[in-house]
A protein has these predicted regions:
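Low-complexity, intrinsically disordered Gly/Pro/Thr-rich segments
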Residues: 180-186
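Non-heme Fe(II)/2-oxoglutarate
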Residues: 1-82, 94, 99-101
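Short beta-strand segments enriched in hydrophobic/aromatic residues
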Residues: 118, 180, 201-203
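Short, cationic low-complexity segments
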Residues: 37-38, 134-143, 217-227
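A short glycine-rich, His/Asp/Glu-containing loop-to-beta-strand
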Residues: 87-94
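Short, proline-centered helix/strand-breaking motifs
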Residues: 175-179
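Double-stranded beta-helix
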Residues: 128, 201-227
Length: 227
């Protein structure tokens, strides 16, 4: 017998080498990106009009290391050719102070998204991903179920699950395809503030690569017209 598990979705988690320094540097500028929580802006700061954390000079080394992980993910894990430059297009805060969770969503305008875990108290919210294929569910709607006697699957694993969650520890960065649906889920007993820097990365071809029929050519060749 042979079994082939094909077309996996790959999520990457890597350790940031100077986390203590990066954490201090961020808390020094945290006040610039803090936001008033309301019904719209509670778990993320993306929509408050200041998604520009990556432009802070004191955080340059932090984001350079994030891009180092992005390059490892792209070149060593996904095995792309070394033909890309990497652009951080926007960055914002993901913050949880209570049981509120981030609903299912994706980042349609980017290639790779990252979450850098700056502060993670015990029982911090977990990061969940949705299976984009569902082929091993055999039919849609075959969910995990709330009651044992209504579950059809004996053991949930990476082969048959419709969702998958991870708990990246503080000082680590998680990378995943931006179009992969993801969310967060609270854990009972959580106290404190889970804080992460979230960002989107676009892969653009290096300036010498103009022969490809797909992908973004280097922005130095773009011409922007005022709207």
């Amino acid at each position: 017998m042979e079994v082939f598990n094909i077309f996996p979705t790959t999520v990457y988690v890597g350790e940031m080498t100077k986390h203590d320094q990066y954490k201090k540097n961020f808390y020094d500028v945290y006040h610039k990106f803090d936001y008033e929580e309301d019904d719209v802006n509670n778990t993320v700061s993306e929509n408050v009009g200041n998604p520009l954390i990556h432009h802070e000079d004191s955080l340059e080394e932090l984001f350079s290391e994030v891009i180092h992980h992005v390059k490892t993910y792209t070149l060593d894990v996904l095995k792309y050719k070394n033909i890309f430059d990497y652009i951080i297009t926007k960055t914002w805060l993901s913050r949880s102070r209570d049981e509120k969770s981030i609903p299912w969503h994706l980042h349609a305008c980017a290639h790779i998204s990252f979450v850098y875990y700056v502060n993670t108290p015990p029982k911090s919210h977990k990061l969940k991903f949705m299976n984009p294929h569902h082929k091993n569910s055999l039919w849609l709607g075959n969910k995990e179920g709330k009651y044992d006697h209504l579950k059809m699957i004996e053991e949930h694993n990476e082969v048959n699950a419709e969702t998958f969650f991870i708990h990246p520890p503080e000082g680590h960065v998680a990378l995943f395809p931006s179009t992969l649906h993801h969310s967060t889920e609270s854990i009972e007993g959580f106290v404190g503030e889970r804080l992460a820097i979230v960002g989107d990365v676009s892969c653009v071809l290096k300036k010498e690569y103009l022969q490809f029929s797909t992908g973004y050519i280097n922005p130095q060749y773009w011409k922007i017209y005022q709207g």
